[in-house]
Regions:
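Conserved alpha/beta-domain cores
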Residues: 1-131
Length: 131
């Protein structure tokens, strides 16, 4: 049984992956993919409307791959889209985002993904192992 302590890094932007990997970390404990989306300045729906779902998936794969390549063969844990509604409202296409008293506790994360995308979300999440 391995009882050693693992040191994992959190990464918000793929461009930080190489520097983070050079620290000798044992992998990525949290890759925040919402920052990949926020950097496009469009909500996922608006990005897909403008560029198509294939381009959206390719954008995510590009960012995740940069991190996965920098840390290979170490583990990379990816968090699904977790931006709060107030951050989405600031993006192109964010006009329809709900106004919430406390966006940090509201419509976000897995709740948002399952409500908006249901079974598609579950099926597509399994593709992360292919990155």
């Amino acid at each position: 049984m391995d009882a050693s302590t693992k040191v994992l890094v959190n990464i918000s932007i793929p461009e930080a992956a190489e520097r983070a990997a050079s620290t000798g970390a044992d992998g990525v404990g949290l890759l925040r993919i919402e920052h990949l989306i926020l950097s496009t300045n469009k909500t996922p729906e608006k990005y897909i409307e403008d560029h198509g779902s294939k381009a959206y998936v390719e954008e995510l794969i590009r960012g995740i791959s940069v991190v996965a390549d920098a840390f290979y063969p170490l583990p990379v844990r990816v968090r699904t889209l977790d931006a709060p509604t107030d951050e989405f409202r600031q993006l192109q296409g964010g006009e329809e985002e709900p106004q919430e008293h406390n966006p940090m506790l509201g419509y976000r994360g897995i709740r948002r993904s399952l409500i908006k995308f249901g079974d598609k979300f579950i099926k597509n999440s399994s593709n992360l192992t292919n990155v």
